[in-house]
């Protein structure tokens, strides 16, 4: 047991350093997003005053080009404040604040990710990025290229990637995972208990997790299919990545709740594009070129290193617990 703790303490030094840097980068992305939407010209001919009713998602509806006076800037600010509120919750809870939670790895060689949302977020975000990179590497070695959907306007695209995590987590986690889990495992009917279980499914008394895992995998596959199913979707190469991401997000939702899964999803969308657009604007280069910038490559390396350490520590815990 002592040897295990010493190994985890040793690995914990670079691991907690990487998680702390990732946390800082996530925090900095909030003002970057505001700067991009309100202080740059990524929209070319349009800006943050562009009416929400003119978006193509409302085409062929009565809402399209109606007199409803709300702009994408208004909705973006609402989303921004909402995500910031969830971000603050993730730092402080549910039982410990972030810095106290990660410091236990170095001090005693033990940790409990369930004590703090941000610990779980930074850890599983790193693992998700690592697995996505591995899938992409394997697919490209077989000539399978992942092509993103074509966006007519960078401002509208950034708005969509900011909105998508909230909508997709509500559909694919709360509706398709949370409610079925409650139906399968709840022993009592109560509105308060129902809402608590949707917020944190681990509140359910899940003794046999086989059905829960099957449900998470099934919904993960649906999540992957949804990313390639439409004419303006990603290319087929995205299916494996999105499926793996959906399964990880489903597992995170089961273990840690909607706060963690939502912010991980937000980070893979808003966070990545915020930095890419920022690089694009300050260097006067296209978004495609910005994604190949040394800063973006450094961010990827940071997540990969953190993901590798996270998986090593996970396996160490499982191995030693099994043999104690």
Task: Briefly describe each language-model feature range.
Residues 43-75, 93-208:
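Juxtamembrane helix-loop-helix connectors linking adjacent transmembrane helices
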Residues 4-26, 71-76, 109-126, 256-259:
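Alpha-helical transmembrane segments and their helix-start/interface "positive-inside/aromatic belt" motifs
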Residues 31-34, 125-147, 217-237:
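Alpha-helical transmembrane segments and their membrane-interface junctions
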Residues 155-324:
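Transmembrane helix-loop-helix hairpins at the membrane interface
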Residues 20-47, 77-79, 85-95, 131-141:
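Alpha-helical transmembrane segments of multi-pass membrane proteins
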